[in-house]
Design a protein with these regions (language model features):
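Hydrophobic transmembrane alpha-helical segments of multi-pass transport and channel proteins
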Residues: 54, 153, 251-256, 289, ...
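Transmembrane alpha-helical core residues of multi-pass small-molecule transporters
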Residues: 45, 64, 90, 124, ...
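Membrane-helix interface "capping/anchor" motifs
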Residues: 51-61, 173-180, 311-317, 360-368
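Helix-loop-helix junctions within the multi-pass membrane cores of secondary transporters/permeases
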Residues: 61, 83-109, 118, 274-345, ...
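Membrane-embedded helical hairpins/re-entrant loop segments and their flanking transmembrane helices
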Residues: 2, 6-8, 19-56, 231-318
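The feature marks cytosolic C-terminal regulatory regions of anion transporters and related permeases
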Residues: 356-491
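Hydrophobic alpha-helical segments within and immediately flanking transmembrane helices
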Residues: 22-23, 40-49, 63-75, 323-327
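Core transmembrane helix bundle of multi-pass membrane transport proteins
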Residues: 1-13, 70, 75-272, 337-384, ...
Length: 491
């Protein structure tokens, strides 16, 4: 660090803080937890994880992609404290995976499954935040829209609509071409407009805004008051078998999202040497273990904040550390200011985040890439929505493997006809799994023809494959079929 980089890191840290603040608050709210939990998660990610991370630019904190897992896990385990115990275990698992150098296995996860996972997270996030944006009361779930057990809040809808409009405007050339505005994050403006609507609306139309839910951050008069707000893990939860399923799910999905973010960030701003994925998993493991102890949300490296950090000119970790310090200061001494922010504004930010994860362009691109990409992609989405994150990812990977095996079998051998001559080209080593395809091709050879086998690219034939070829070779003379370059001996 020197004065030259500091001049770039300080404003970068401020911008990252402004982007992270509404996301930290919104993700906590979407998880059904107090907003302070989101700020605490951002502080741990910004200060602790950054200190151990090998990346100079990756920003860690609460991730929108884990919201659905957090909500489902708390519901499964019954209490937030039991979830925190699972989070401690998840952090330990991440640390062990880092020690075992498991980061390199990220390359084994198919791209179609990863994209499907992110799209499913986006869809679930949208489904979860629609009731909040509409000012849900009554059922409070999306299903309440169809059952009739749902009442709307006009003030919430107006605030959420204004937030979505601002977020859209901030992506248009009109705003991007205004340099002064292009540096201000759209989510921050959306939240500020919501806060101003609350402040001035209370004076002008108090009845209209009476039903507008807002953030409720506690005030901390002392460190003891802060400590009283922190919730610790329930160590008795070790008796619950579901805790270990949740811990493994959190560890795998958080690690996957972190390493994907790191790969994407390296394309935006290459580092030399390339940050070690194993060291990153160690850092994330430390952060998530501490988050579980202190009562925070799961932590991952997040591409949105990381890309902002790079785009505004960050040169070192100082910008990320500064954003963590600012989140801490904001949570400790400016809670009154944050308490004017309506939940509908945060819902707008999260709805837009969900849309970006599951944009229609992504579906169109996957369809254009063909069934081999689209089928595992859509299977992953359906699996995650219907059965949960781990089951959905497992289904997606299994579908990709089966489809790859199918295509490999189709491409392993080809039969070409030249008048009464047939050429059977074997393109790769064959196993017993290729027998049905081989038998079908051999059955296409008519009587009184010539069959030539091109097996120059084959080093190994399974004994079962040889048995099929030998059986055909012994019957061929009786059908008037002449064999050329036959790969097995016949009587």
């Amino acid at each position: 660090m020197n004065m030259k980089t500091l001049r770039q890191d300080l404003p970068a840290g401020l911008v990252v803080f402004l982007v992270a603040l509404p996301l930290c608050l919104g993700i906590a709210q979407a998880s059904g937890l107090p907003p302070f939990v989101g700020l605490l998660t951002g502080v741990i990610g910004g200060l602790v994880v950054t200190s151990f991370s090998p990346s100079r630019f990756a920003v860690s904190g609460p991730a929108a992609g884990l919201v659905t897992i957090v909500v489902a896990s708390i519901e499964t385990l019954g209490t937030f404290s039991a979830f925190l115990f699972a989070l401690v275990l998840a952090g330990i698992i991440q640390f062990i995976l880092g020690m075992l150098r498991a980061g390199r296995f990220i390359a084994l996860v198919p791209g179609s499954v990863i994209k499907g996972m992110l799209a499913a997270i986006g869809i679930l996030l949208i489904m979860q935040q629609i009731p909040v944006a509409l000012g849900a009361s009554g059922d409070g779930e999306l299903s309440g829209l169809f059952s009739g057990d749902f009442r709307f809040s006009t003030s919430s809808m107006l605030v959420a609509g204004a937030g979505l409009l601002i977020l859209w405007l901030w992506t248009t050339p009109v705003i991007k071409n205004i340099k002064a505005l292009s540096w201000i994050p759209g989510p921050l403006i959306a939240v500020l407009i919501g806060g101003l609507a609350t402040v001035f609306g209370e004076r002008l139309q108090p009845d209209f805004l009476a039903s507008l839910p807002r953030i409720t951050l506690p005030e901390f008069g002392s460190l003891s008051a802060l400590a009283a707000e922190l919730e610790g893990p329930d160590w008795q939860a070790w008796r619950n078998p579901s805790v270990y399923v949740v811990a493994i799910t959190l560890a795998l999905v958080a690690s996957l999202e972190t390493l994907l973010s790191q790969e994407a960030l390296n394309k935006l701003r290459p580092q030399n040497p390339h940050p070690s994925p194993n060291r990153e998993m160690l850092a994330q493991g430390i952060g998530n273990t501490l988050a579980g102890f202190l009562g925070a949300l799961p932590i991952t490296a997040v591409i949105v904040r990381s890309s902002v950090n790079v785009s505004v000119g960050a040169q070192s970790k100082v910008s990320i550390l500064l954003h963590g310090v600012l989140l801490l200061i904001c949570g400790l001494w400016f809670s009154d200011l944050l308490n004017v922010i309506p939940l509908a504004s945060l819902a707008a930010v999260l709805l837009y985040t969900g849309y970006k994860l599951a944009t229609p362009r992504l579906f169109i691109d996957q369809i254009r890439m063909g069934a081999q990409q689209f089928v595992p992609f859509i299977t992953t989405i359906i699996g995650i929505i219907a059965f949960g994150m781990l089951a959905g990812i497992g289904l997606g990977i299994a579908t990709q493997i089966l489809y790859s095996i199918y295509k490999s079998h189709r491409n392993a051998m080809h039969l070409t006809r030249y008048d009464d001559h047939y050429v059977l080209r074997l393109q790769q080593n064959l196993t017993f799994m290729h027998n049905p395809r081989l038998q079908n091709l051999l059955d296409e050879i008519p009587e009184n023809s010539v069959l030539i086998v091109d097996h120059d690219n084959v080093d190994y034939l399974d004994p079962d494959v040889k048995a099929v070829l030998k059986d055909f070779g012994e019957k061929a003379p009786r059908r008037g079929i002449r064999l050329n370059q036959w790969p097995v001996a016949v009587k």
